[in-house]
Amino acid sequence: QTKFWQTGMIECGVKYGLSSTNNHMTTDSIFNDIPLSQTPQDFRYDEHVAAAYISVGKQFGEHWSVKLGLRGEYTYSFGNWLSADSVTRRSYFNPFPTAYIGYTTSPLGNLQQPIAVSASYTRRIKRPNYWMLNPFRTYVDAYSYQEGNTALTPEFNNDVELHFSWTQYLNVTFNFAHTQDMFSQKTTILPDGMGYTKWINFGTCTTHGGNLSLTELPLVPKYVTAEDGTKTMQGAWLALTVNAGWFHFINKSYEKNAEGKSAYENRTHYGYVGGTLSAYLPKDWTLTFDGNWSSPMTTGYNKQGSMYFLSFGVRKMYMPKGLIFNLNIQDLARSLSMVDKSEGMAPGYESWHENYVRQQRVMLSITWMFGQYQQHKNRKVGNMDELNRLGGGGGVQTGN
């Protein structure tokens, strides 16, 4: 990176990533201690991603800032899916532009900005997780199974945001996004009644909506009296943090009906709200109460049910000794459950499952700070994108 015209900055860089998976696995079917069959799961998958980017930013006066950027990515992938007796090769290049313009009523660099407004545009790529590509068949029960899709291609997202902030407390964001080749799982009913679920590039998803967040808004301010008798606010006895949003979804499948229109189209709404109420008591005691709720949401062929979650925490600090005691109680109402339903199936069929996640727990932690504290900034570079695509298990999974 280099500066120009005092307040301008040019940055450029390159990145190369290689991921290679060589999987050998055999699944044994056993009934009454008698081996029935062996199913191999052998494949080799290599992916090369080469990228280069350049961005130019400039401050104009004390209130305006502009930034433009462009990233180009070339991808080559090879998959030898031995168990499925198929080979896939892909080679493609994609540009990803970005643009940003911002205005503040106070000089740039002032942390106590009274009002700030910005607008941005970004284009992103999301490659399928490796387990989405794995064609290995996983049986859910005697009448259904699921598998990956070696022909799955990346999805692309175009996002436009208008952001407004007031001091350090209030942030409001209006968002419009359009996703192409969106990932979704589709359940198909076979003539024998067996159902199978497979990852596909569903189609497009268009969303628009907004988000509002309040950060540590003082409900009961704490005042400090100076020697001359003047009072100034310093923190709060009771503070509220809230994050809420509402979005409208339009899902359209690439699959067409006899009239040439999308065979499946769904228009739904989605909303969520979460908040934390913090009480800062004398002698460094802190009480927190957290609550989160989200409405049902439909993306592609998949519909998720609503859920809510409650937690409570107590913290005690002994600053002279550098000791911090934390007691947290999660899922107070034992309410955390997830309901998923498959849409767009054959008439007369429906598929849904409910998963109860037992997250109710009590955690006690003790932190002792000593010596000189130094904050280290971790920069995410290299293979972070590839690691995220491995899934929670840290390796290639056979299902979702």
Give short role names for the model-derived ranges.
Residues Y16-N22, G72-F78, Y103-T105, Y121-R127, ...:
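Transmembrane beta-strands of outer-membrane beta-barrel pores
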Residues E47-V87, S91-G102, L108-D159, F174-Y196, T241-W246, Y272-P296, Q330-P347:
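Surface-exposed extracellular loop regions of Gram-negative outer-membrane beta-barrel proteins
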Residues W5-I10, H63-V66, S106-L111, I115-V117, ...:
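Repeated loop/turn-to-beta-strand initiation elements of outer-membrane beta-barrel proteins
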Residues Q1-N80, S106-N110, T207-G245:
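Face-selective signature of the C-terminal outer-membrane beta-barrel domain
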Residues Y318-N400:
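C-terminal beta-signal and adjacent terminal beta-strands/loops
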Residues Q41-Y45, I125-H178, T197-V220, H353, ...:
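Outer-membrane beta-barrel signature, preferentially recognizing the C-terminal barrel domain
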Residues F202-N292:
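Gram-negative outer-membrane beta-barrel transporters
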